[in-house]
């Protein structure tokens, strides 16, 4: 039998009690009668009438006797026993011993029947409690199962909603992409329609192309072939200019790098040369090109030179600077004379020098005559900036004497020693002192 919650339940125990009351004629029977009555009242179980219920059927006890004892039956055979009948239907009442009395032995037998029935009823009640506990456990398990199924259904519903949302987003994105492609195709079609000229314009364009072709044919093949030859030549020249520019930049970087490395050694060399009397005068007089310009008074003035420095300007290709240091002498008052060559942006070379403050009566002769040629004197080189010979002196000093003056100083005694590099003649340059060292 199943209830409303779907759990199978055990039908209640159906009991029908039949209580038989007899009169107990003796004291022993009265005592048993009272005990049985108390037990029957304590163990009566009321149930709903009809099918599946437990019913108690009891006969009313006969009234007590006039003597104040236990009620007696008319025959005086004993008390009325009470007992329960299990499994009956409806209300049943069985009277026994109302008209005919029963012997006391039958009263004892009835009491035994009641006790047995009472024991069976207790077992039935305990079984019913156990059945109720089992039913409660089954109901709790069914409730937990139902709750888990509801939660799983909710999770499944949430997942379905998420998947549905993702599918909807993907479909909307695909729709947007399709719309964009459709718009792009429409725009391209419009552009193609706009680019297509009218029929009249197409005719004009074709006519212009035909006229241009006729003009090229009339000019002949020579200009075309010349253009074909000039284009590769111009391309090669552009590439060559690019390589030259890269070489210039690399050369400048190398000059800066090694210039810093040389500076340390040049400072040490200058310090040693300052302590050698007449070092630079001897080097100048032993140089094959410079010795021709040192005559008479120039040789005397060079005896007072203490040091010489050649420095390039900020950019190596923009020029250089010559510094001559002198000690006190009777010819001029300057202790430092500077000769500077600067290459301007136009490419023209400009020379500048410190004015020499001559002492009275010691102005040098500007030119000397040798083999019918006018030769610039050494000290005239400081102040005269017009003759090409002046630029030649600067080139010799910068490129030959300054890098290695020791080799010319050692020629004083005519001793040929091993040189780090051989003597070289100064190279003629196409323009005045361009300092084309690279």
From Swiss-Prot:
Crosslink feature (Glycyl lysine isopeptide (Lys-Gly) (interchain with G-Cter in SUMO2)) location: 156
Taxonomic superkingdom: Eukaryota
Keywords from the named record: Isopeptide bond, Nucleus, Ubl conjugation
Region (Disordered): 41-82
InterPro entries: NAP-like_sf, NAP_family
A family per Pfam: NAP
Gene Ontology CC annotation, any one: nucleolus
Gene3D superfamilies membership: 1.20.5.1500, Nucleosome assembly protein
Family from the record: Belongs to the nucleosome assembly protein (NAP) family.
Protein name: Testis-specific Y-encoded-like protein 1
Species for this entry: Pongo abelii (Sumatran orangutan)
Record lineage: Eukaryota, Metazoa, Chordata, Craniata, Vertebrata
Recorded name of the encoding gene: TSPYL1
């Amino acid at each position: 039998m199943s209830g409303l919650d779907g759990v199978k339940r055990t039908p209640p125990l159906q009991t029908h009690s039949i209580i038989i009351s007899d009169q107990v004629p003796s004291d022993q029977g009265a005592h048993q009668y009272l005990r049985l009555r108390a037990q029957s009242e304590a163990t009566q179980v009321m149930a709903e009438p009809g099918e599946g219920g437990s019913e108690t059927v009891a006969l009313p006890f006969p009234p007590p006797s006039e003597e104040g004892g236990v009620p007696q039956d008319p025959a005086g055979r004993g008390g009325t026993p009470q007992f329960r009948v299990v499994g009956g239907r409806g209300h049943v009442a069985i009277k026994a011993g109302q008209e005919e009395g029963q012997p006391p032995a039958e009263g004892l037998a009835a009491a035994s029947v009641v006790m047995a029935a009472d024991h069976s009823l207790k077992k039935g009640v305990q079984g019913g409690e156990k059945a109720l506990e089992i039913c409660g456990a089954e109901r709790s398990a069914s409730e937990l199962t139902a709750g888990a199924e509801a939660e799983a259904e909710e999770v499944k519903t949430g997942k379905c909603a998420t998947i549905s949302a993702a599918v909807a987003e993907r479909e909307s994105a695909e729709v947007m992409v399709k719309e964009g492609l459709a718009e792009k195709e429409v725009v391209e079609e419009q552009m193609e329609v706009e680019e297509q000229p009218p029929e009249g314009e197409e005719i004009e364009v074709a006519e212009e192309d035909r006229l241009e072709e006729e003009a090229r044919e009339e000019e002949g093949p020579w200009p075309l072939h010349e253009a074909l030859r000039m284009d590769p030549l111009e391309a090669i020249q552009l590439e060559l200019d690019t390589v030259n520019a890269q070489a210039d930049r690399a050369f400048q970087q190398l000059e800066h790098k090694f210039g810093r490395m040389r500076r340390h050694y040049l400072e040490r060399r200058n310090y040693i040369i300052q302590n050698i009397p007449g070092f630079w005068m001897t080097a100048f007089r032993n140089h094959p090109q410079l010795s021709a310009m040192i005559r008479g008074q120039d040789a005397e003035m060079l005896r007072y030179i203490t040091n010489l420095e050649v420095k390039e300007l900020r950019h190596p290709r923009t020029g250089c600077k010559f510094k001559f240091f002198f000690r006190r002498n009777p010819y001029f008052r300057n202790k430092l004379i500077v000769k500077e060559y600067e290459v301007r942006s136009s490419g023209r070379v400009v020379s500048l020098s410190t004015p020499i403050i001559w002492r009275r009566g010691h102005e040098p002769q500007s030119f000397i005559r040798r083999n019918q040629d006018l030769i610039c004197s050494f000290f005239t080189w400081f102040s005269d900036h017009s003759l090409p010979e002046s630029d030649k002196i600067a080139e010799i000093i910068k490129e030959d004497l300054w890098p290695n003056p020791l080799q010319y100083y050692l020629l004083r005694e005519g001793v040929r020693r091993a040189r780090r590099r051989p003597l070289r003649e100064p190279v003629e340059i196409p323009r005045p002192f361009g300092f084309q060292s690279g």
